[in-house]
């Protein structure tokens, strides 16, 4: 059981592992079904298509490697594959999160209530429908914050040498932070915490959030496991919210 008051900081690895445990809790599983279905349908189809295209995309990406780096091609090839998986995985997980955002918010709310014993607002299906415009506005805020930064990093991929060495590392770090924002935002948004204030709060536990986001990013690239990662990450992020942020930011007790 996660405490409802602020506790000593734990690692992002801990909260990620908690997500796997919490997602199977009795009473929670029914709120997991819809996010899970969205993720299975979208990510399953997307990665099936991706693996049919890799033999075209990877040689194209490797063609940008300058002659003086050709001797490292045996190392750059797996980096190129990982780069494609990172970019592709993050792109489609973002789409899946847009579609499932109302259900992810409900999952975070119900899990928080069970972890803390607090009484959440009376939502239900009607409440979710009323909240959809606000939730979509929040997703749009995240997208606007993310897009210009992602474009800059994607441009780096087309710079010979940099695109095959530095860019993948920067993209991984960026996607780790962005996935931490994506999943931690659900419990924050349930309490109407502004997007900017939420980002400021996450920076107080930046290492833990980077660890959490990095693991989420890695599992997003792994076939089969990436089909269930969405509800797992929501549960893990909600546990982190309860331990680290709820005492200061909670709207309902």
UniProtKB/Swiss-Prot annotation:
State the superkingdom.
Answer: Bacteria
Q: Does the keyword Transmembrane apply?
A: yes
Gene Ontology terms describing biological process: cysteine biosynthetic process; sulfate assimilation
Compartment(s) of residence:
Cell inner membrane
InterPro entries listed in its UniProt record: CysZ_sulfate_transptr, Sulfate_CysZ
Task: Give a single Pfam family match.
Answer: EI24
Sequence intervals crossing the membrane: 31-51, 75-95, 151-171, 222-242
**Which keywords does UniProt give here?**
Amino-acid biosynthesis, Cell inner membrane, Cell membrane, Cysteine biosynthesis, Membrane, Sulfate transport, Transmembrane, Transmembrane helix, Transport
Gene Ontology cellular-component terms for this entry are: plasma membrane
Q: What does this protein do?
A: High affinity, high specificity proton-dependent sulfate transporter, which mediates sulfate uptake. Provides the sulfur source for the cysteine synthesis pathway.
Q: Which family does it belong to?
A: Belongs to the CysZ family.
Q: Which PANTHER family match?
A: SULFATE TRANSPORTER CYSZ
User: What is the protein name stated in its UniProt record?
Assistant: Sulfate transporter CysZ
Tell me what organism the protein belongs to.
Citrobacter koseri (strain ATCC BAA-895 / CDC 4225-83 / SGSC4696)
């Amino acid at each position: 059981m996660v405490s409802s008051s602020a506790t000593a900081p734990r690692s992002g690895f801990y909260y990620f592992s908690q997500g796997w445990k919490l997602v199977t809790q009795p009473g929670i599983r029914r709120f997991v079904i819809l996010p899970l279905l969205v993720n299975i349908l979208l990510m399953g189809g997307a990665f099936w298509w991706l693996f049919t295209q890799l033999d075209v995309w990877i040689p194209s990406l490797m063609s940008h490697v300058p002659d003086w780096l050709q001797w490292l091609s045996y190392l750059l090839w797996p980096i190129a594959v990982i780069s494609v998986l990172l970019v592709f995985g993050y792109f489609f997980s973002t789409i899946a999160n847009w579609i499932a955002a109302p259900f992810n918010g409900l999952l975070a709310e119900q899990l928080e209530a069970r972890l803390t014993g607090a009484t959440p607002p009376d939502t239900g299906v009607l409440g979710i429908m009323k909240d959809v415009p606000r939730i979509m506005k929040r997703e749009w805020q995240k997208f606007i914050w993310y897009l210009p930064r992602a474009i800059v990093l994607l441009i780096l991929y087309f710079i010979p040498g940099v695109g095959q060495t530095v860019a993948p590392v920067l993209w991984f770090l960026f996607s780790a932070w962005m996935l931490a924002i994506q999943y931690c935002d659900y419990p924050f948004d349930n309490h109407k915490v502004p997007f900017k204030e939420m980002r400021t709060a996450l920076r107080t536990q930046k290492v833990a959030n980077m660890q959490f986001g990095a693991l989420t990013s890695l599992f997003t690239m792994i076939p089969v496991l990436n089909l269930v990662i969405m509800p797992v990450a929501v549960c893990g992020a909600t546990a982190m919210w309860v331990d680290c942020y709820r005492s200061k930011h909670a709207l309902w007790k």
